[in-house]
A protein has these predicted regions:
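N-terminal Rossmann-like NAD(P)+-binding domain of SDR-like oxidoreductases, especially those catalyzing
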Residues: 1-175
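Short, flexible, glycine-rich and Lys/Arg-enriched loop motifs at helix boundaries
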Residues: 39, 170-191, 201-222
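Pocket-edge positions in alpha/beta enzyme catalytic cores
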Residues: 51, 63, 90, 183-187, ...
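The catalytic Tyr-centered alpha-helix of NAD(P)H-dependent dehydrogenases
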Residues: 127, 138-145, 184-191, 223-227
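C-terminal substrate-binding subdomain of Rossmann-fold SDR/epimerase-dehydratase oxidoreductases
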Residues: 194-330
């Protein structure tokens, strides 16, 4: 049985990956400072180590103590707007934090890492669907930090033979149907939980930012991928590395685009609630259409999304939000 350190494993995507690791016979050890994660998202039988990504000595100690074989790295700050207002926080937490993690891995002789990257590394795409060799022109600090980490990983691979898989997510959504975990951010910035919180009455209204885009209904189109499908991809990437596979970069998306209006209409149908929607002006830096090509990971690792239909994504998220109107706190 192999031991996997999951940094940020008490967070939204990390907690779902912990579940998938357990299903596949791995032993996850969660390393999280709980600044945005939730201890309640970590199963009782899983070791939760409360620690900071910048503490190289403690990281090395934990890697040695638990005989860590590989790392899956989620720990990061991830609010696009905040990254533009407070870039120092993002370069410190994301770039310097990842450097500290890599140094701890090097010192502890841990040679495999799966990295949580983002479609934000592409910026405004020149064409869709977006492939891994598309231009990398991030338009915000968050995306730039993730791209810098990808470059660091490539350099560590070249210099120290530390193998990696970087996974560029599109829009993660949904919740586990088998465990009581879901999406709980403060502040919340993702469309589907915002919509569902409005349906619950936790929020007064949900806003559409821009209705004059060059799309079928004038609103932005995004590629939504179920968090459980993302979790499966992480385990496939890990198995690829442990089997001696070379370093890789993959997109993770459903390859289907849905507009903001389509998501809102689907949520109204699934919840049976006609909540208030308001129209606002565009936000700067929002591309009209972002849709992934996941052909590369499908061809190389056999990853196929199994539950990333809009109905499945919204239905599983709605079930979790109904049971947790105040998130993990209530």
């Amino acid at each position: 049985m192999m031991n996997v350190l999951v940094t940020g494993g008490a967070g939204y995507i990390g907690s779902h990956v912990v579940e998938e690791l357990q299903k596949n016979g791995f032993t996850p050890i969660v390393y999280d400072n709980l600044s945005t994660g939730h201890a309640a998202a970590v199963p009782e039988e899983v070791q939760l180590v409360e620690g900071d990504i910048h503490d190289v000595a403690f990281l090395k100690h934990i890697m040695a103590r638990f005989e860590i074989d590989a790392v899956i790295h989620f720990a990061a700050s991830s609010l696009v707007g905040e990254s533009m207002e407070n870039p120092s926080k993002y370069y410190f937490n994301n770039v310097e934090g990842s450097l500290h993690l890599l140094e701890a891995m090097k010192g502890a002789v841990v040679d495999y890492i799966v990295f949580s990257s983002t479609a934000a590394v592409y910026g405004e795409p020149e064409s869709v669907p977006i492939k891994e060799d598309s231009c990398l022109k991030p338009t915000n600090v968050y995306g730039r930090t993730k791209l810098m980490i990808e470059k660091m990983l490539a350099d560590y691979d070249m210099a120290y033979e530390m193998r990696y898989v970087a996974l560029r997510y599109f829009n993660a959504a949904g919740a586990s149907p088998s465990r009581d975990i879901g999406e709980d951010h403060d502040p919340e910035s993702h469309l589907i939980p915002l919509v569902l919180k409005t349906a619950q009455g936790v929020r007064r209204q949900v806003a559409i930012y821009g209705t004059d885009y060059a799309t079928a209904d004038g609103t932005c189109v995004r590629d939504y991928v179920h968090v459980c499908d993302l979790a499966t991809a992480h385990v496939l990437a890990l198995k690829h590395l442990l089997a001696g596979g070379a370093s890789r970069v993959y997109n993770l998306g459903s390859e289907n685009g849905f507009s903001v209006r389509e998501i809102i209409d689907a949520a109204k149908k699934i919840t049976g609630i006609d909540f208030t929607v308001v129209e606002e002006s565009r936000r700067s830096g929002d591309p009209a259409v972002l849709i992934a090509s996941s052909e590369k990971i499908r061809d190389e690792l056999g990853w196929v999304p199994k539950c990333s239909t809009v109905n499945e994504v919204i239905s599983t998220a709605w079930k979790w939000h109904k049971g947790h109107p105040q998130g993990y706190e209530g």
